[in-house]
UniProtKB/Swiss-Prot annotation:
<dbReference type="GO" id="GO:0032991">
    <property type="term" value="C:protein-containing complex"/>
</dbReference>
<dbReference type="Pfam" id="PF01391">
    <property type="entry name" value="Collagen"/>
</dbReference>
<comment type="subunit">
    <text>May interact with ERFE.</text>
</comment>
<feature type="compositionally biased region" description="Pro residues">
    <location>
        <begin position="50"/>
        <end position="59"/>
    </location>
</feature>
<dbReference type="InterPro" id="IPR008983">
    <property type="entry name" value="Tumour_necrosis_fac-like_dom"/>
</dbReference>
<dbReference type="GO" id="GO:0005581">
    <property type="term" value="C:collagen trimer"/>
</dbReference>
<feature type="compositionally biased region" description="Basic and acidic residues">
    <location>
        <begin position="75"/>
        <end position="87"/>
    </location>
</feature>
<dbReference type="Pfam" id="PF00386">
    <property type="entry name" value="C1q"/>
</dbReference>
<dbReference type="GO" id="GO:0005615">
    <property type="term" value="C:extracellular space"/>
</dbReference>
<dbReference type="GO" id="GO:0005102">
    <property type="term" value="F:signaling receptor binding"/>
</dbReference>
<feature type="domain" description="C1q">
    <location>
        <begin position="154"/>
        <end position="290"/>
    </location>
</feature>
<comment type="function">
    <text>Involved in the regulation of lipid metabolism in adipose tissue and liver.</text>
</comment>
<dbReference type="InterPro" id="IPR001073">
    <property type="entry name" value="C1q_dom"/>
</dbReference>
<dbReference type="InterPro" id="IPR008160">
    <property type="entry name" value="Collagen"/>
</dbReference>
<dbReference type="GO" id="GO:0043410">
    <property type="term" value="P:positive regulation of MAPK cascade"/>
</dbReference>
<dbReference type="InterPro" id="IPR050392">
    <property type="entry name" value="Collagen/C1q_domain"/>
</dbReference>
<dbReference type="GO" id="GO:0042802">
    <property type="term" value="F:identical protein binding"/>
</dbReference>
Length: 294
């Protein structure tokens, strides 16, 4: 028989033992019940009596079958940080790293002290000639020189020039520089300043023929800062020519030039393949008794 059947049989016997006194209770008289109550032992179906003393421990049972491994538990909370450990020994030097990129340029340092003077260097090559300086002030008239040799039959003193421009639209109220020399007899015209400077006192004739385009033209002939003649020509959309001429009595050192006398009316036009603008002057005759006259 199996253990289960043994246990079932034992329980059945216990229940049967409890049921027999209860079944006999109706058949017993009052006498019999009184005897039971007075001194007889209590039956199972009567009221429970006091708890009896514990029985002796039973023999240990056999070990059960090992159960399955449970699921892993959840991670517990992190513990507090431990105390800092002692410093370890210094390790061996590492390998040399790659060269870094060049850093930004630093600020200029303070100027250092002047070093000792070096030896004299080799002489350099001569430089280019500088631009001509400004014309100096006119000097005092010198004393008369000794009489020169006779030049009977020779011509009188000469002074004549004819010049042209090489740029368009000159600035107003300044001498126009006619820098293309066609003739400069005696060298009395200064191309750098645009002025004719009288060296032979006498009567002179001056004339000009100016080409204009795209702008109006207001030009005048100036003698020692004063306008002697003025010419105005309006722009018609085509090339045009403005002309003027006069005769002047000049003394030694007098200056004559052309200039624009009104703002934004400087229509003088230069075209090397089409037209020229000319300024011309020459001596008609010198004053009597002039030392330059032969």
């Amino acid at each position: 028989m199996t253990i289960f059947k043994k246990v079932t049989t034992m329980i059945s016997w216990v229940l049967l033992a409890c049921a027999l006194p209860c079944a006999a209770d109706p058949m017993l008289g009052a006498f019999a019940r009184r005897d039971f109550q007075k001194g007889g032992p209590q039956l199972v179906c009567s009221l429970p009596g006091p708890q009896g003393p514990p029985g002796p421990p039973g023999a240990p049972g056999s070990s059960g079958v090992v159960g399955r491994m449970g699921f892993p538990g959840k991670d517990g909370q992190d513990g507090q940080d431990g105390d800092r450990g002692d410093s370890g020994e210094e390790g061996p030097p590492g390998r040399t790293g790659n060269r870094g990129k060049q850093g930004p340029k630093g600020k200029a340092g303070a100027i250092g002290r002047a070093g000792p003077r070096g030896p004299k260097g080799v002489s350099g090559t001569p430089g280019k000639h500088g631009t001509p300086g400004k014309k100096g002030p006119k000097g005092k008239k010198g004393e008369p020189g000794l009489p020169g040799p006779c030049s009977c039959g020779s011509s009188r003193a000469k002074s004549a020039f004819s010049v042209a421009v090489t740029k368009s639209y000159p600035r107003e109220r300044l001498p126009i520089k006619f820098d293309k020399i066609l003739m400069n007899e005696g060298g009395h015209y200064n191309a750098s300043s645009g002025k004719f400077v009288c060296s032979v006192p006498g009567i002179y004739y001056f004339t000009y023929d100016i080409t204009l385009a795209n702008k109006h033209l207001a030009i005048g002939l100036v003698h020692n800062g004063q306008y002697r003649i003025r010419t105005f020509d309006a722009n018609t959309g085509n090339h045009d020519v403005a002309s003027g001429s006069t005769i002047l009595a000049l003394k030694e050192g007098d200056e004559v030039w052309l200039q624009i006398f009104y703002s934004e009316q400087n229509g003088l036009f230069y075209d090397p393949y089409w037209t020229d603008s000319l300024f011309t002057g020459f001596l008609i005759y010198a004053d009597q008794g002039d030392p330059n006259e032969v």
